Amino acid sequence: YCSILVKVRDGRPIKIEGNKFSTVTKGGTSARAQGSILSLYDKYRLQNPTVGGKNASWEVVDKEIADQLSAVKAKGGKIKILSSSVNSPSTKQLIADFGTYFGNTELIQWEPISVSAIATANEKSFGKKIIPAYNFGNAWSVVGFGCDFLGSWISPIEFTKQYVKNRKITHDNPVMSKHFHFESRLSLTGSNADVRRVVKPSQEGLAIISLYNKIASKAGASTLSGGSLDSATEKILDEAANHLWDNKGKSLVVCGSNCVSNQTVVNGINNLLGNYGSTIDLGSTINLNQGSDADVNRLVDEMNN
């Protein structure tokens, strides 16, 4: 998500800038937002509807779709609408009206970069299938696992504005937050971390469990079974655990994995640290990514049967 202003010359958009009046992005933009304007001038983009890969008129396409929908309605069949996340109230109302008319209609939301494991993990942990609001501005200790929250994860422009709040040393703010990052490839977020450690994708779950066990030992909670990592990685995890524990309630652990198990353990870490209500708000949700892997998989199964 990015609230923007567009500079126009002779009716043509030529430059994107952030909207400083936005309470979410606060005037920020991203490379993705800046580059999106180029798609308007892509001569290879689709300019007409197509049928079987060939250009067709809107009249032909509309008639064919309407005829097929009417045939499905007459037979009492199912209609699925596959879409990216829908947040517009007017679009939701149109879909609802569509479903009322045709009946037996379901909206399936899908995202190319899925984070549905977060919502599923929160449903398991708290009974709420949501993506909570994260506040990096309240965190003095941040640990990330394969999570490019400054580049591409969920709401990077919003998170960047929050993150830099505690990364600038001033006369009134002489202390800077500390950021540990574990990832398999270099990301924008990892390059800005104070401590960065390369961890194989196959070892990410072990690293998360190791951090959980270190925090659980300090909290007097039960630990989880898991394998061991190399001594250098364990040493950095020890340092991260100590810094997190010293900043209980003012810390944040995030994970970019779309694995429900990993996200559930991360929930446990944040819970032991008392971060809910401070750096994580379950009462305020992020609705940008509403796609559900389970719904898409179910749709594929139904189409194959």
Positions of PLM-derived features:
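Active-site phosphate/pyrophosphate-binding segments
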Residues: V195-N304
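Short, surface-exposed connector motifs at secondary-structure boundaries
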Residues: S70-K80, D246-L252, N305
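N-terminal export/assembly segments and adjacent metallocofactor-ligating motifs
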Residues: Y1-D238
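Generic low-polarity alpha-helical segments
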Residues: I4-V6, V142, N270, E302-N305
